[in-house]
Amino acid sequence: MMLGTEGGEGFVVKVRGLPWSCSADEVQRFFSDCKIQNGAQGIRFIYTREGRPSGEAFVELESEDEVKLALKKDRETMGHRYVEVFKSNNVEMDWVLKHTGPNSPDTANDGFVRLRGLPFGCSKEEIVQFFSGLEIVPNGITLPVDFQGRSTGEAFVQFASQEIAEKALKKHKERIGHRYIEIFKSSRAEVRTHYDPPRKLMAMQRPGPYDRPGAGRGYNSIGRGAGFERMRRGAYGGGYGGYDDYNGYNDGYGFGSDRFGRDLNYCFSGMSDHRYGDGGSTFQSTTGHCVHMRGLPYRATENDIYNFFSPLNPVRVHIEIGPDGRVTGEADVEFATHEDAVAAMSKDKANMQHRYVELFLNSTAGASGGAYEHRYVELFLNSTAGASGGAYGSQMMGGMGLSNQSSYGGPASQQLSGGYGGGYGGQSSMSGYDQVLQENSSDFQSNIA
């Protein structure tokens, strides 16, 4: 039996999937058949720590019968979005509202703000000038980098007091150089999740003499299943993707880094088909510098995407179409340079219409021309910075011509041809190297045994 408000549980439902711009009036209209306690005041929206709508809300109703009516609205649409309705209670509602939003204990009173959209190569001195007149604590500026040592376009700044931090927030959308800077409330905990790169990677920058593909818990093993989703979160989605979850060594599912200490989130993010299965759509890049988008509104056009990245000028936009002929909510955006692609990542989690969009970097410094295909494959990733022709083709190992030979969970003979200029990775073009490749592969297998 459901207890009344005096018993502590109340008559509460939780709503998920609301449009980001949803108002209390719209929620009231959605539940027009139900009696909401205190009208609009009985609708409690949930916000992120940056103060943005999360797409969820609690609704307080007047009786158990009203709760039952509200639950019948589950999976009905608001605009063009399906809205989920769950049974909840006062205890859950109070806890969630206390621990989320910009004024939660995790974000209040520590003087931190997060900057997004910094120009490529922005220095701490430029940030100090940007906040001229506002006191920053000593060593209070943190500039996160990715696993390749590149700037993420973000920064964390700790001010001498929360009051000063509040003043800093008023500089939201002001410029550094030609870039608009977004400023959000932050916390020490958020800084730690973005800035503590795994120390073990430092010892993995160069391959050892006995490194070999596919050996046990080796760095090349690419698993399937839960690890893919963890990988897809990427370093820009809070934390460091697959590494934090699996300590970088995979254990057969998910992956953190390859033999050379590179984060595989960057190399494999941007794959198209999320059914963890067979292939998917293929996008051919002419520059090798792409950003993959996920979470687009289904009515988004190419022009919307060009405007989203303004003032950057993408070379080309490719909106993905699924096997059923419908848009997937994903797209690939090609840029002229690696620097432009990195700068575009500053728009990660920014809104397009009512949805926030996730971005995944698919660019390698120094890559020039050549096409790559992003598909789900069971091969380990072979990619070298500065490769010409096809940045995702083959990698020569020790001068022995061992390229695209070993696979994880698939036939050892599976090939991914098209490496250097489209003719140096496949079996048919290896000619005299075939025998060497086979002998080396056999040696590796015997070493493993």
From Swiss-Prot:
Subunit structure, interactors included: Part of a ternary complex containing FUBP2, PTBP1, PTBP2 and HNRNPH1. Identified in the spliceosome C complex. Interacts with IGF2BP1. Interacts with CUGBP1; the interaction is RNA-dependent. Interacts with MBNL1; the interaction in RNA-independent.
Protein name per Swiss-Prot or TrEMBL: Heterogeneous nuclear ribonucleoprotein H
UniProt cross-link Glycyl lysine isopeptide (Lys-Gly) (interchain with G-Cter in SUMO2), position: 35, 87, 98
Organism: Homo sapiens
Location relative to the cell: Nucleus, Nucleoplasm
Ranges of residues in domain RRM: 11-90, 111-188, 289-364
Domain comment quoted from the record: Each quasi-RRM repeat bound poly(RG), while only the N-terminal QRRM bound poly(RC) and poly(RU). None of the repeats bound detectable amounts of poly(RA).
Disease tied to this entry: Neurodevelopmental disorder with craniofacial dysmorphism and skeletal defects: An autosomal dominant disorder characterized by global developmental delay, severely impaired intellectual development with poor or absent speech, characteristic dysmorphic facial features, and variable skeletal abnormalities. Additional features include feeding difficulties, inability to walk or walking with an abnormal gait, and cerebellar or other abnormalities on brain imaging.
Entry function: This protein is a component of the heterogeneous nuclear ribonucleoprotein (hnRNP) complexes which provide the substrate for the processing events that pre-mRNAs undergo before becoming functional, translatable mRNAs in the cytoplasm. Mediates pre-mRNA alternative splicing regulation. Inhibits, together with CUGBP1, insulin receptor (IR) pre-mRNA exon 11 inclusion in myoblast. Binds to the IR RNA. Binds poly(RG).
Gene Ontology biological process terms in this record: mRNA splicing, via spliceosome; regulation of RNA splicing; RNA processing
Record-listed Dimethylated arginine modification sites: 233
Location of region: 2 X 19 AA perfect repeats: 354-392
Expression induction or repression: Up-regulated in myotonic dystrophy pathophysiology (DM).
Entry-annotated residues carrying Omega-N-methylarginine: 233
Keyword Ribosomal protein (UniProt): no
Keywords: Acetylation, Disease variant, Intellectual disability, Isopeptide bond, Methylation, mRNA processing, mRNA splicing, Nucleus, Phosphoprotein, Repeat, Ribonucleoprotein, RNA-binding, Spliceosome, Ubl conjugation
Pfam family, one: RRM_1
Sequence repeats, residue ranges: 234-249, 354-372, 374-392, 418-433
Modified residues (Phosphotyrosine): 246
GO MF annotation terms: identical protein binding; poly(U) RNA binding; RNA binding
Gene: HNRNPH1
Keyword Plastid (UniProt): no
Tissues showing expression: Expressed ubiquitously.
Region called 2 X 16 AA Gly-rich approximate repeats, residue ranges: 234-433
Residues with PTM N-acetylmethionine: 1-2
GO cellular component, one term: nucleus
